[in-house]
From Swiss-Prot:
Active site annotation, chain numbering: C178 (cysteine persulfide intermediate)
Family membership: Belongs to the TrhO family.
Domain annotation Rhodanese: ranges: 122-218
Described function: Catalyzes oxygen-dependent 5-hydroxyuridine (ho5U) modification at position 34 in tRNAs.
Organism: Chlamydia abortus (strain DSM 27085 / S26/3)
Gene Ontology terms for molecular function: oxidoreductase activity, acting on paired donors, with incorporation or reduction of molecular oxygen
Catalytic activity: uridine(34) in tRNA + AH2 + O2 = 5-hydroxyuridine(34) in tRNA + A + H2O
Coiled coil region boundaries: none
Identification of the protein by name: tRNA uridine(34) hydroxylase
BP-aspect Gene Ontology terms: tRNA modification
Classification lineage: Bacteria, Pseudomonadati, Chlamydiota, Chlamydiia, Chlamydiales
EC number annotated for this UniProt entry: 1.14.-.-
Length: 326
């Protein structure tokens, strides 16, 4: 099938005097375009994940670069076959990355290109730090990277404190990376505040590395926050051996699902055989739960939508009404 949609990942830190106006302009523009997205705008700038029919995506990129303050936005593009978000979401978020503390964005690590990053990996001189959540690096990461056991962005400040106690900040050079680069903009500042003298950040994140270098020193797949959930970092190299395993049978696997049990919704890795036997659930206990969303093999591992929650509620109400009649 011809891939005629684009997936765009981008962010830009810049002063935005009227975020609500930018949000309104985005929403108005998208009314007539075949797109879906999750875009956050604040006084700090913009953080966007977007998908759209190729001509509409190109129109949006040109439009945004013509907006005051956004002329230098860099878009990372993947070719896809359909929209990958459930709806158009453009909203205000005070923190573009939900860190929970203030950081000095004027004091950041040194941005290095994917090529420079690869060369430094070859040197094996620095501590390579994955600053993503644990469920992200579980299915893919750089060779020999330090993998913090954190599940939310807000846990990183405490981890930065821990890191400064485990390694001498004055003599430990750090190379940090994330999916697209925006988390490193904040996290590098935190490490500098903790006394680390030499902090590098991968410009454009893992996405840019995959596009510029290829698989290189990367192992596994890249977790993404959209319907795909996991992708190879090199579009030309899709035969990627899994580095994770099924949570039920430990078969090598890197496919994520969210639990069909409405009251769980846990994100878990599962093979094709086990996902069927457990009715799309993360455990046998969840497979016996009263509010299970219907799982069909044809839907693949696409995350459940809110409408499934509505369907479960409706079925429960209808069942209750039926009981009352007898």
């Amino acid at each position: 099938m011809k891939k005629n949609y684009y997936a765009l990942a981008y962010y830009y830190l810049t002063r935005v005097d009227n975020p609500q106006q930018e949000i309104a302009l985005h929403k108005e523009l998208f009314k007539d375009l075949d797109v879906s997205c999750r875009i956050y705008i604040s006084e700090q700038g913009i953080n966007g994940q977007f998908s759209g029919y190729q001509p509409d995506a190109e129109y949006y990129m040109n439009w945004l670069r013509q907006r005051p303050g956004f002329s230098n936005v860099k878009f990372k593009i993947h070719h896809i076959e359909e929209n990958i978000f459930p709806r158009v979401t453009v909203k205000y978020r005070k923190e573009l990355v939900a860190l929970g503390c203030d950081v000095d964005l004027s004091n950041q690590g040194k941005h290095i290109s994917p090529q420079e990053w690869h060369e430094k990996l070859e040197e094996n001189r620095c501590l390579v730090l994955d600053v993503r959540n644990n469920y992200e690096w579980k299915i893919g990461h750089f060779e020999n990277a330090v993998l913090p056991d954190i599940r939310t962005f807000r846990e990183f400040p405490d981890y930065a404190e821990q890191l400064s106690k485990e390694h001498d900040p004055a003599t430990t050079p750090v190379m940090m990376y994330c999916t697209g680069g925006i988390r490193c903009e904040l996290y590098s500042s935190l490490l500098l505040e903790k006394g680390f003298k030499e902090v590098y950040q991968l410009d454009g994140g893992v996405i840019a590395y995959g596009q510029a270098v290829g698989t290189g020193k990367w192992r596994g797949k890249l977790f993404v926050f959209d319907d795909r959930l996991a992708v190879p970092i090199d579009e030309a190299d899709t035969d990627v051996p899994p580095i994770a395993s099924c949570s039920h049978c430990e078969t090598p696997c890197d496919t994520y699902y969210n639990c069909a049990n409405t009251d769980c919704n846990n994100l878990f890795i599962c093979c094709k055989e086990c996902i069927h036997s457990t009715k799309g659930c993360c455990s046998q206990e969840c497979s016996q739960a009263p509010r299970i969303r219907s799982f069909a093999p044809c839907r693949g591992n696409k995350p459940f939508r809110r409408m499934h929650l509505c369907e479960v509620t409706k079925e429960k109400e209808e069942a209750a009404s039926s009981c009352c009649l007898h």
